[in-house]
Design a protein with these regions (language model features):
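Buried hydrophobic core signal strongest for RNase H-like alpha/beta domains in large
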Residues: 1-378
Length: 378
C-alpha cells in the first residue's frame, strides 16, 4: 500500500469558490503510445519451405575457450589444497564457481552505459501474426531513421519461429534479423542441463548422489527439469566432487604444482593477477586434468560415462561464461555443442530453433556491414 501527500502553502491558496461542472466530455482516442497495427496476410505456402539446414562451422579450439577451460581447472583444483593450507592462507572456505569467476573476470574490460527506454505498445495478442509483423515493420523503420543497415529484433522461442517465417517471406523486411532472446538462450541451457543431462544420467547413481544433499522427494524434480536452480547447484557440486577425486592425488603428489597452485589461487583471489597471468600454471593443471580423464575413460564404461557427464556440464560453464562476458565465438561454439544432446533427448523444437538461430548468426559476418558486425559481436 502506498500513499500520496498533496499540500499547498497557505499564501498560495485562493478564496474558495464553487467549481462549475464541466458539461462537455473529454475525448481520448488512446492512440498515444501505441503503434498502428499493420495486418499480415499469411501466404498459402509457408516461408519455411525456402529455409534449408546447412552444416554449421565447427571451431572447437580458440583462445577464449582455452582460457575458459584453464581457469575452470584452476578453480576445480583449488579444492585439492590441504584444509590447513586453505585456513592459513584464506581464512574462509573457497568460493563457488560463480564467486570465483566474478573475481577472476573483474578486469574483463571497459563498458559504456546504454540507454534503455520504453517503446509504444501494440494492442494485439503477442502470438498474433499481425502483431509480430507490425513489430518487425516498426523496428525496421526505427533502424532506417538511425541509418543502420541491419536491424535485430529479439523474441523468445515460439515467437522467434513465427518472426523468422514472416521475415523470410517479406522482401521489405530483408534488413530485419529475428534473433532468440537472451532469456530463451538461458531457457535452452535450462532444457539442456535439467532434461538432457538428467535423461542421459538416469539410473547411473546420480540420483543417490543428489539425495545426500537434497531431500529425496526433490531429486526427481531435479532430474526431470522442473527445478533449474537446484539442478544447476546439484550438478555443480557433483562436478566439483568428481574433479577433486580426479585431481587430488596428482596434485598432492607433485609438490611443485601444489606450491604454484596455492600461490596462484591466493594472488587471484586477492586481485593481484589477471586471468592472462594465470595461463602458465593453468595450462599445466588443464593438461593434467585432461590426461587423467583420458586414462580413466579407457578403464571401463562406467568411468567413461562419468567423464562424459563432466564434459556435458562443462558446456554449461562455457555457455554461462559466454553470455556473461559477451564472448561471441564461445557463445556460438557452446550452443553448437549442445545441439546433439537436444536431438538425443527428443527436444526437437529447441533443436530446430537453435539450429536456425546459429545458421543466421554465422551468416552475419558475410551479410552485415563490417563496422556494424564488429560492434554487434564485440
Amino acid at each position: 500500500m502506498g500513499g500520496i501527500s498533496c499540500s499547498t502553502p497557505k499564501q498560495h491558496q485562493s478564496i474558495p469558490n464553487a467549481v462549475s461542472r464541466t458539461k462537455g466530455k473529454i475525448v481520448m482516442d488512446g492512440t498515444k503510445g501505441r503503434i498502428p497495427v499493420v495486418p499480415y496476410v499469411k501466404p498459402a505456402l509457408s516461408s519455411f519451405k525456402s529455409i534449408y539446414a546447412s552444416d554449421l562451422k565447427v571451431k572447437r579450439s580458440f583462445p577464449s575457450m582455452e582460457k575458459a577451460l584453464q581457469i575452470d581447472s584452476v578453480w576445480m583444483s583449488s579444492f585439492t589444497l590441504p584444509k590447513e593450507l586453505i585456513q592459513a592462507r584464506f581464512g574462509t572456505r573457497l568460493p563457488s564457481w560463480s564467486g570465483y569467476m566474478e573475481v577472476a573476470h573483474a578486469d574483463s574490460g571497459p563498458y559504456d552505459v546504454s540507454e534503455v527506454k520504453f517503446l509504444p505498445f501494440i494492442n494485439l495478442d503477442p502470438t498474433n501474426l499481425s502483431c509480430i509483423y507490425t513489430a518487425l515493420n516498426f523496428a525496421s523503420d526505427q533502424c532506417r531513421k538511425q541509418q543502420l543497415k541491419t536491424c535485430f529484433v529479439t523474441f523468445d522461442q515460439p515467437l522467434f519461429m513465427k518472426a523468422t517465417e514472416i521475415s523470410t517471406g517479406c522482401p521489405e523486411l530483408k534488413q530485419v534479423v529475428p534473433v532468440n532472446h537472451k532469456s530463451y538462450m538461458y531457457n535452452s541451457s535450462d532444457i539442456y542441463v535439467t532434461c538432457c543431462i538428467g535423461e542421459i544420467m538416469s539410473g547411473s547413481g546420480l540420483e543417490d548422489l543428489f539425495a545426500t544433499v537434497y531431500a529425496k522427494n526433490s531429486v526427481p524434480q531435479i532430474m526431470s527439469g522442473h527445478s533449474y536452480a537446484r539442478a544447476m547447484r546439484a550438478h555443480s557440486l557433483a562436478q566439483q566432487a568428481l574433479g577433486v577425486i580426479i585431481l587430488k592425488n596428482e596434485i598432492v603428489a607433485d609438490s611443485t604444482i601444489l606450491a604454484e597452485l596455492s600461490s596462484l589461487h591466493q594472488k587471484l583471489m586477492g586481485g593481484e593477477v589477471s586471468c592472462e597471468e594465470t595461463r602458465p600454471v593453468a595450462c599445466k593443471i588443464r593438461k593434467l586434468y585432461q590426461d587423467k580423464c583420458l586414462e580413466l575413460s579407457a578403464l571401463n564404461r562406467t568411468a567413461k560415462l562419468w567423464i562424459e557427464y563432466l564434459n556435458q556440464f562443462e558446456l554449461v560453464r562455457l555457455f554461462t561464461r559466454a553470455m556473461r562476458c559477451g564472448d561471441w565465438q564461445l557463445y556460438l561454439d557452446s550452443m553448437k555443442a549442445m545441439l546433439p544432446y537436444f536431438h538425443a533427448a527428443a527436444h526437437l523444437p529447441y533443436a530446430k530453433a537453435v539450429h536456425i538461430h546459429l545458421q543466421k548468426m554465422e551468416a552475419l559476418e558475410e551479410e552485415m556491414d563490417p563496422f556494424e558486425f564488429e560492434n554487434f559481436t564485440r
